[in-house]
Structure formats: C-alpha cells, structure tokens
Amino acid sequence: IIPLNAKYYLCTLESMPIDKDLEFVGIDEIQMCADHERGHIFTERLLNLRGEKTTMFMGSNSMKNIISTLDDDIEFIDRKRLSKLNEDIEFINRSRLSKLSYVGHKKISRINRKTAIIAFSAEEVYAIAELIRRQKGGAAIVMGSLSPKTRNAQVELYQSGDVDFLVATDAIGMGINMDLDNVYFSNLKKFDGKKLRKLNLSEIGQIAGRAGRYLNDGNFGITGQCKNIS
C-alpha cells in the first residue's frame, strides 16, 4: 500500500518505482550486481535508472572498474555528484574511523559479551544459540528467512540488553547496524544456492565490519571448528 502523494520511497530494489520521475535515486550495496540471484535486477537499475537531479550508488567503489568500462568518456573526480554514466562520476570512499582487528580463534565459552557469531545455515544458527543459552543465558537470532517483524524483534532483544549475544547468518552484513564489539565466524563456507563455497574477502569484510562502528574499535575472529582466515 503506497500512501497518496508519498515524497519518499524506502523499498527493495525489486519493488522500487521505475515509472515515476524522481529527483533522487539511491541504491545501496551496488556490488550486489554480482549476486547470482538478484544481480540482474541491480545491473538493470545501474544501467537504466536515474534520478532527475541526483543518483547515488552506495558501495560503488567496489564497482569502479566495471563502471569504467561502460563508456570511454567517464572521468573519476573527487567532489562532484554521481550522475549519468556518460558524464562525470565521483566515487567517494569513506575510510572507517575506528580500528578493526583480527584476534584469531576463541572458544564460544570464552567469547565476551556484545558479540555476534556468524553461521550459514538455520541448523547451525539454532545450535549455536542453544549452546550460548546453556552457557551464557541467551542469544538473539538474525536470519534472512525471518519475517521483518520477527527479525526486528530479535534485533531489539539484543539492542535493549536483554541478551548479550547475537547469532546470525550473513544477513547481518546488509543494512543492520548494531552495537557489537566482536564478530566471530563459526564457518567460512556458505551454500550460495548452487554450491558450497568459501566466502570471498569482500564478504568477510562486510560481515566483520559490523564489529565496532564510528569511533568504537572492533574485533573479529573465528570460533568452533572454523579454520584460520588466510
């Protein structure tokens, strides 16, 4: 249901209006062009959708080389807006303000509070959450398969301090900002819909970067049977 005369649309890429004249269009996680399930939608929007005044692709630095091949006349400069592909394009890379450190392996029983543990199947997520419940008193759960209402309730359970731990899939890396000091991977492999594969470095960085935000330093590491990150 879209309200009459809505001034803003906050929506998924698939549901965003493409038949309206909008002054501003912003698309987050533009590197999802490479995703095997949703990449065709991101690519179509990258190529064809523009705001009348401003178009912004967040995460676009990872797409710089690809966008550079779309037109011979593209120039990359520092302080102009991101506009049409045949005009000047600016890539702004904002450095992280806090320090993110790799701390190696740690047993779940020794992991400190304000920690997220990452797994890549519902079975793993629930098993780890149950282990934390027995050892430490409880954990919130975040998975992409949860309904928005349930996921938000779990996020609030953690953010309110009712529980000190979070167990999540890689859904935590997309648009969820929480008060985390640590992120630990219980696995570095995921099933991507076609095959079981290792996480690439950008995926590891996206998830690990949930630890510490703004001026607060963060740590990431591995736990359980997970092999060392190399």
Would you name each region that the model predicts?
Residues 1-3, 11-16, 121-123, 141-153, ...:
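Conserved helicase motor
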Residues 24, 31-100:
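Post-DEXD/H (motif II) to motif III coupling segment of the RecA-like Helicase ATP-binding lobe
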Residues 55-58, 111-135, 139-143:
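Conserved strand-helix element at the start of the C-terminal RecA-like helicase core
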Residues 2-14, 97-104:
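Short glycine-rich substrate-engagement loop in P-loop NTPases that contacts/grips substrate
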Residues 53-54, 59-65, 178-230:
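Conserved segment of the helicase C-terminal RecA-like domain
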Residues 6-29, 35:
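Conserved RecA-like ASCE ATPase "motif II neighborhood" in helicase/translocase motors
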Residues 6-8, 21-24, 51-57, 114, ...:
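Loop/turn-to-beta-strand initiation segments
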Residues 12-21, 46, 125-126, 166-185, ...:
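SF2 helicase motor core recognition
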